[in-house]
Amino acid sequence: CDAVIYLIALIREFPKKGLTNEKLQFRGSEKVAKIAENLGINRFLLMSALGANPNPNGSKYMQAKHLSEQAIKNSKLKWTILRPSSLFGDPRGEDRPEFCMMLDKLMLNLVPYPKFLPFPAPSFFTGASPFNAGQYALSMVHVKDVASIFIKVLSDDETIGKTIEIGGERKVSWNEIIKSIASATGQNVFMLPAPFFVIFSIAGFLDRFEWFPAGQDQLKDLIKGSVCNSHELFKKYEI
């Protein structure tokens, strides 16, 4: 059947380049939905994000994802919204930017550092105590698994009008993620507790520069974590 799958998302905004979440995520999906209606294409899958919400104090990324969901829900389309947690993996093998590669490049290899010394990787914490540093978790899921679910959902009429959350089989903390990436790339790291409000303030000044590892939006979402249980979903589709 004819269908539209809207995957466009913008992890980090650069307004001076015209790259904003409102433009590419919200307005883009809204426009494509209207085009689909005009062309008589009824089936529409929207890739949203786990944690999408209208909170004005939240990230612009999650706000835009929420607005996209509302636009699709208000359409006449046979829609399904899919909300994955953090994705990893490059299925085409073309070394395009992806979660783990970007962490390795922008955090573990941002500045020259002797390989024989443990690299001080930031482990963010909120509040006054550093004992919870880096414990926020993600249900990371491979992009190939998400693609497989999209294919299954496309022909599953029971998912029409539904919102589906997608996450990996286990929760992985920030500290575990960084240590795993370092191990896979032959590096040695130690997790250095870093006050979130300090890093967040610095990002407010520097996130306009592409070389800076993360913007305030990304930090807001990271510190909240992104966790769900999709065991039954994977079981249903035999993935």
Report each predicted region and the residues it spans:
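NAD(P)H-binding glycine-rich loop region in Rossmannoid oxidoreductase-like domains
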Residues: 1-39, 50-55, 154
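A short helix->loop->beta-strand "cap" motif at the edges of active sites that frequently abuts
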Residues: 38-43, 75-77
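Oxidoreductase cofactor-interface core, primarily capturing Rossmann-like NAD(P)-dependent enzymes
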Residues: 54-172, 179
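Mid/C-terminal beta-alpha module of Rossmann-like enzyme folds, strongest
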Residues: 147-214, 228-239
